[in-house]
Structure formats: C-alpha cells, structure tokens
Amino acid sequence: MPRFNQRHAPRACAALLAAVAGLTHAAFANAHAVVGDRVFPATMTVDDPGVGDEFDTQFGHIKTSDDNGNGINVNTVSYEWDKLITKNLAFSVASQYVSQNAPDGGSAKGWDNVTLGVKYLAYTNPAHEFMASVGLKTEIGGTGAKSIANPYSTFTPAVYVGKGFGDLPASLGYLRPFAITAELGPNLTTASSDQGPNSLGWGMTLQYSIPYLQQQVKNLGLPQPLSNMVFVVEAPMSTCTAGACSGQTTGTINPGVLWLNRYGQFGIEAQIPVNRASGNHVGVLFDAHLYFDDLFPGSLGKPLF
C-alpha cells in the first residue's frame, strides 16, 4: 500500500529526502497485493501496486547537512492507514513526526503535513503476475509544524505497476521468484518554482521472494525465518523539473529484507545516497506493517461497500 513518501520531510534536509522515501500459499491468501501466485509485499519507499486495509509504522534515521554544510541528525516516525472503500478502491491518511538535531544544539521537532490519498486497482493479469493501479496523493500545506512542514500543498497523481517473473519457463525456475514494481508521478506544488519547485517522483524495486521459491519452484526445506523472507532493493528517486534545481535528480538505493506472515510484515533497509546532492551518509529504515484485512476481516479489514 502507499508508502509515506519522505520527499516532503524537513526543508533543512530536503535534498537528501527528496526521493525518500516458508508459509503455505493459504497463509498469504488475503494479503493485499496478490495477483496469480504472486504476492507483492508493502515496500518502504516505493509504493506497491495493491490496495488493502492495513496500517503501517516506520522509523527512519539519517545524517544529512543543511545549506551551510552543518551535520544534522534526522529521525522520523511515520504512520499510514489505508482503508478499502470497495475491493478495488482505497483511501489513505499519513504523516510523520520529525526530529532534527544539529551539533550546535539547534533542533526542530514536530509533525509534518498530513497527506491524503486515493488509489484504484485498475488492471490485473494473473497468468503473467501483473497488476497496475492509479492514484492521487495530496500533501495538505500548513497542517504540520511551521518549523518542519511546507506551507504549500503538493498534488501527486501517479501510476503503480508490478510484474512477477513467474511466467518464465521451468528451465529458468530459480529466476521465477524475482519481481519488479515501479511508480511514476509528478509532484505539483502550489508554491512558486523558487519556494517549492515541481518535480517528477519515480522509483523501482527488485524483489526475490523465498516464499515463492519454496511454494512455486522447489521446496528446499529452508528454515524459519529465512523461509518467510523477501529480499528487496528499492530505488526512490526525484527529478526537479523547475527552478534553480531543474534537471537535478536525488534519491537513494535501499537494500534490505522483509519478513512476512499472514497478519503483517517487518522490514529493515539501508538508505545509500545516489550522488552528492542526495547526501553523504547512509541511513536506515525500520518498518512494521499490519494487514487489517486478515487481522479484522469482519470489521476494520472489511471494505465499506
């Protein structure tokens, strides 16, 4: 489900955070992003193509620099709640609490703006493990702390796709657990190009699912917790399209691992800046994600209509 995108985090570290963002098959039967035999897990910084009833919390830590080159430690705690309106249409609300601490003792703390979203699962092809969704996220300017949040709003219409490699021939069986997902959408602000330039948000993930390997290719008898792991590399990026930064791309490469069960998932990823404009330090993300459609199928996990 929609990841809370950290590109709208504190202005002091905007350059780096611009982009940032062995069970049985029945155990995953109600997971939210399922097409054919493929389960796309909820990734941390690149939104997956599914919709569902779920709740996500995430902790992030990274060291970056302000405009004067001073080092700043940035800690974030974010949440996102997704609610199905119908089986193919979901609404979301998200925000994050940000704490910036500079070596000279200066600090800024508070909530970032609230982000509202809507997402529609538009197409699935089970035979080819492909699914696509469209959505709109709106960061509502001025709803967060003045020291942290942007005073302007940002609208992000986006497309989300996922493709599993399960349709490869049997001779390439050990490649079938691979999958890719991607998202693409402009970030359109209500500010001037100097204060809040527009940008193009884009990202991809490469995944290798051990549960898929065990269930659909060959049961190797791998023990817990390895049998429930999905290894992933995410690449959340943002390319400035206006103002003085026009043409500049920032982002991170995030290698990590997700551990899934029927009711949710846990994950950890590193954040490695792709260039100097993105930062000089490696960060870390921790994530806990609950599937309300499995935990509370008759209440919180049930579509409204």
Please give the residue ranges for each predicted region.
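Bacterial N-terminal signal peptides that target proteins for export
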Residues: P2-A15
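Compositionally biased, intrinsically disordered low-complexity segments enriched
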Residues: H8-P10, A27, V34
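Transmembrane beta-barrel domains of Gram-negative outer membranes and organellar outer membranes
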Residues: A29-F305
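N-terminal signal peptide c-region/cleavage motif recognized by signal peptidases
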Residues: A21-F28
